[in-house]
């Protein structure tokens, strides 16, 4: 027995066999490496914290999917105006968009209840209780019903930003009481929050984010509320106004969301859908903790570098807003059954959570660490 016994014999390919092999190879299916483009048009400018969060969302989705989903984040007004984002996503003009559910109030007033819960004492929900209700207390199911069945939009929604309570806003006028405030032309958010200011007797103007600073420079508005110090800085309010009024009760919850076209989303694999969902949840938490950290720093920057005077909102303004908030919730609930369902669901959940979380908030509200 020789060594050749254990060695494989060389294979000789004839021209015919080689041609056949090539034909089989050329006809075999080729695995595509093309990625799915996912454009997210935001309702905020580049440079804002929300835009930063969206870019991180895109980077993580791209990395986790090995490039199968190519997320491209576009700033406010890049393709459509901010108030048209939902409609553009619905019809597939863009794959996704970012704004706050209150921006969809033209379709149904209840959208604001999932984004900018009005006047904390009226609903009983602060930011964390709102998320507890949304994820654990049936809030998400109500929102899906609202968007997909009541409004009839072909979208899937993912909360991605949270910034908690919002200041009253910016002005060049010292405000000592509600009467002073009522004399100003005040830019409000759209939807329910704007209605509350109207109910209170404030002269309101709604402007999209693209219009805010130019309108202030032209004197179209005397005072403007946006989001918080970090986001307001990105808008440039510190270059237009001298006074920044904090401590308002009109809005204690702020949730920004990505809405994704349902056809686009349904065509993704279950694994890639899970990546989008879990990535949204991860940046949602980061946005909240980053928001607290940076807003504290930004207030100092406003005062030391820009000469902004940080003011406390007069108490009678907050009392008037509380009364107006209660009234608008009652009026809207009487007008619309779905709106009433959401308000009841939120209040019921807030009541059930109060034995635990309300006690904690009460302690925080009455005690401070010694200097």
Residue ranges and their predicted role:
Residues 1-9:
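N-terminal secretory signal peptides that target proteins for export/translocation
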Residues 10-12, 31, 47:
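Intrinsically disordered, low-complexity segments enriched in proline/serine/threonine
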Residues 14-27:
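Bacterial N-terminal signal peptides
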Residues 26-34:
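Signal peptide processing junction and immediate N-terminal pro/mature segment
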Residues 33-130, 150-371:
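N-terminal secretory/targeting leader peptides
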Residues 138-152:
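Hinge/lid segment of periplasmic solute-binding proteins
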